[in-house]
Amino acid sequence: MKRIAILTSGGDAPGMNAATRAVVRKAIYEGLEVYGINYGFLGLVNGDIRKLELGSVGDLLHRGGTFLYSARYPEFATEEGQLKGIEQLKKHQIDGLVVIGGDGSYHGAEALTKRGFPTIGIPGTIDNDISGTDFTIGFDTALNTVLDALDKIRDTATSHERTFIIEVMGRDAGDIALWSGLAGGAEAIIVPEESFNMDDVVDRLNKGRERGKKHSIIVVAEGVMSGNEFAKQLAEYGDYHARVTVLGHVQRGGSPTAFDRVLASRLGARSVELLLENRGGLAVGIRENRIVENNIGEILKEKHTLDQKLFDLASILSI
């Protein structure tokens, strides 16, 4: 193993730059050459590859986004796309690859591994929806972004004695909604993994009113329905004329938290070690604060599950 490359793919997540920095500096420390691939798998196929030095990743640790850029390239799922990628890697004499991203990125990494090219996956997505790890890079930062907004919305909800609905990201996973809702004291948390009944939500709000509570916060994951649609349905139950805030892509940006920076650094460094050990086809992660690695194919077969105990706790504490 003399040369390795790194790319970021799919939706950006705070901490991707920190992980890239760790891969580059750990690899150079171990005597390897490192190449950065711009625009994910699209850049790989197009040969948009450049050599990275120690200084290339300076002033990156605290920056959100990804300086390697990202792009969606569904064509990489085809044999033609994968063979073009392998051709470019061989052309640049690259021996191993690190891929930072979510589920789709892992599929690309697995495809390369099956074609005999050593590839390591690093979980980088704000959704926290990757199996084999307690946390993904970017989740903690996104969570704190949502919590900051929730706290501020709580101020105005209290001042005007209103119900506010906050729509957060999470098409298939409700971790952002659950964790931010619990941390922010939301009166109701609506996630894709748990069915909900509007009658139950209204009953919870009414009980709060009976105790003298004059405002409430409801956090809705986008995968369930839009915040506006939820507000429309809620209004059918009486004078719940809720205000809606859609946080959108602000959740993806911002300087990564200390937790995400440290997590990204640990996962990035471990990825290089695995390549040096000629152990491709693995995804790194963190379990109970220990860095672990799992077969990337097995990770893709597993379905991420919501923390049921945490969901139940949020329901109890929001009474």
Swiss-Prot record:
Biological processes per GO annotation? canonical glycolysis; fructose 1,6-bisphosphate metabolic process; fructose 6-phosphate metabolic process
Task: Supply the EC number(s).
Answer: 2.7.1.11
Residues holding Mg(2+): D103
Q: Known InterPro entries for this protein?
A: ATP_PFK, ATP_PFK_prok-type, PFKA_ATP_prok, Phosphofructokinase_CS, Phosphofructokinase_dom, PKF_sf
The entry's localization annotation reads: Cytoplasm
Can the keyword Repeat be found in this entry's annotation? no
Q: Which Pfam families match?
A: PFK
Identify which residues the record assigns to the active site. Answer: D127
The record's principal subcellular location, in a coarse class, is cytoplasm
Specify which residues bind ATP according to the UniProt entry for this protein. Answer: G11, R72, Y73, G102, D103, G104, S105
UniProt-listed NCBIfam families:
PFKA_ATP, PRK03202.1
Biological function: Catalyzes the phosphorylation of D-fructose 6-phosphate to fructose 1,6-bisphosphate by ATP, the first committing step of glycolysis.
The family annotation for this protein states: Belongs to the phosphofructokinase type A (PFKA) family. ATP-dependent PFK group I subfamily. Prokaryotic clade 'B1' sub-subfamily.
* PANTHER family reported in the protein's UniProt record: ATP-DEPENDENT 6-PHOSPHOFRUCTOKINASE, PHOSPHOFRUCTOKINASE
Query: Subunit structure, briefly?
Result: Homotetramer.
The protein depicted here goes by the name ATP-dependent 6-phosphofructokinase
Question: Which species?
Answer: Listeria innocua serovar 6a (strain ATCC BAA-680 / CLIP 11262)
Q: What is the lineage of its organism?
A: Bacteria, Bacillati, Bacillota, Bacilli, Bacillales
Q: Which gene encodes it?
A: pfkA
